[in-house]
Regions:
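P-loop NTPase Walker
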Residues: 1-105, 109, 211, 265, ...
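Conserved helicase NTPase motor core
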Residues: 6-16, 20-24, 54, 62-63, ...
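ATP-hydrolysis module of ASCE/P-loop NTPase motor domains
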Residues: 18, 78-81, 99-194, 217, ...
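Short acidic/histidine-centered micro-motifs embedded in hydrophobic/aromatic stretches
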Residues: 86-89, 138-141, 145, 198-199, ...
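Glycine-/small-residue-rich beta-strand-loop submotif within the FAD-binding core of flavoenzymes
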Residues: 272
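Conserved N-terminal phosphate-binding loop of PLP-dependent enzymes in the Aspartate aminotransferase
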Residues: 275
Length: 281
C-alpha cells in the first residue's frame, strides 16, 4: 500500500500488527495520531468491516481529522466507523440502550453550566452556605467520584471522604450528591460523567448488551491513552475482552488530563491486563 511508504520502520510495524493487544508508546510530535489513522486505514484495506472498528479520541478535532483523512482514502465507507471522543461514542450507545436504565432515548445531556445551575438550586433548597458549597467545586468533587465509580451510596459510607468534607465545613456533601443524582434522573438528563458511568453500568448489569458490543467492536483503538481515566479504561477493557484486538497509543511522558482523574497507571496496568501485548516504541 503506497500509504505505508510514508511511515518509518517502527510505525509500519505498529500499523500492520492488527491482531492481539498492541501498545504504541511515542513522544510528543512523533505522529502518534497519524499511526492510529493509518492503522484504521490498514484495517479497512485488509477487508475489515468499518462498523466493527471503534476508535476513541480525546478531542472532537482529533476525531474529525482522522475521519476526514480516512474518508479521503476510502470514501463514504469511512462514515461507518465508530470514531469519536469517549463521550460522543458512549452517548451514541446510550441513546439506543437508555430505556434499560430507565432513561428516555432522547435523554438530555447537561453541560457543566447546566450541572452547576442545578447544583446551585439544590444548595439553595437545602439551605446550605453557597460560599462553602460552590457549584464548581461540588461538581468537581462529584465528577471525581463518578470517574472512580463512587456513587452517592458509596460516598455516604466512605469515611475518608466524609471526614474530609467535615474538615472542610461541608458535612452535607453526600446529601447534595444524592439529590443531584436523583434530580438528573428525574429530568431524564445525564451530565458528561454520566455518559461514561451509565455506559459502565449498562455493560455491568446487562450481559446481553455487553455481549453485543464485545462482538460488534472486534477492533478497538484509543488515542492519547495516557489521558484515559479509571472509568474510561474499565469500559474499554470490558469491550475488548473477547477479541483482544485492542491498540492503545500513548506517551508515557505526558498526561495533560491529570485533573480529570486521568491515570498513568493505565499504561502500567495495560501490560498486566493484556499479557500478550506487543509494545512498539
Amino acid at each position: 500500500v503506497k500509504l505505508l511508504d510514508t511511515l518509518n520502520e517502527a510505525q509500519l510495524a505498529a500499523v500492520t500488527n492488527i491482531h492481539g493487544p498492541t501498545m504504541i508508546i511515542a513522544g510528543p510530535g512523533s505522529g502518534k495520531t497519524r499511526v492510529l489513522t493509518f492503522r484504521v486505514a490498514y484495517l479497512m484495506h485488509s477487508g475489515i468491516d468499518p462498523f466493527s472498528i471503534l476508535a476513541l479520541t480525546f478531542t472532537n478535532k482529533a476525531a474529525r481529522e482522522m475521519k476526514n483523512r480516512i474518508e479521503q482514502l476510502y470514501g463514504t465507507d469511512a462514515r461507518n466507523l465508530w470514531m469519536g471522543t469517549f463521550h460522543s461514542v458512549f452517548s451514541r450507545i446510550l441513546r439506543s440502550e437508555a430505556d434499560k436504565l430507565g432513561y428516555p432515548s432522547n435523554f438530555t445531556i447537561y453541560d457543566s453550566e447546566d450541572a452547576k445551575n442545578l447544583l446551585k438550586t439544590i444548595v439553595k433548597e437545602m439551605g446550605l452556605n453557597d460560599k462553602l458549597y460552590k457549584p464548581g467545586y461540588v461538581l468537581y468533587r462529584i465528577s471525581l467520584c463518578k470517574n472512580n465509580l463512587i456513587g452517592p451510596e458509596a460516598y455516604a459510607v466512605n469515611t475518608d471522604l466524609i471526614s474530609e468534607d467535615e474538615g472542610n465545613g461541608r458535612p452535607k456533601m453526600a446529601e447534595v450528591y444524592k439529590n443531584y443524582t436523583k434530580r438528573c434522573f428525574r429530568a431524564g438528563a445525564m451530565d458528561f460523567d454520566d455518559l461514561l458511568l451509565k455506559t459502565h453500568e449498562l455493560l455491568e448489569r446487562f450481559p446481553d448488551v455487553l455481549y453485543k458490543y464485545q462482538h460488534r467492536f472486534k477492533y478497538v483503538m484509543i488515542d492519547e491513552f495516557q489521558d484515559t481515566n479509571f472509568l474510561q479504561y474499565s469500559i474499554v477493557k470490558r469491550i475488548a475482552d473477547v477479541f483482544q484486538n485492542i491498540a492503545v497509543v500513548g506517551d508515557d511522558a505526558q498526561s495533560i488530563y491529570a485533573f480529570r482523574g486521568a491515570s498513568i497507571a493505565n499504561i502500567l496496568n495495560f501490560e498486566k491486563d493484556f499479557p500478550e501485548v506487543k509494545t512498539f516504541r
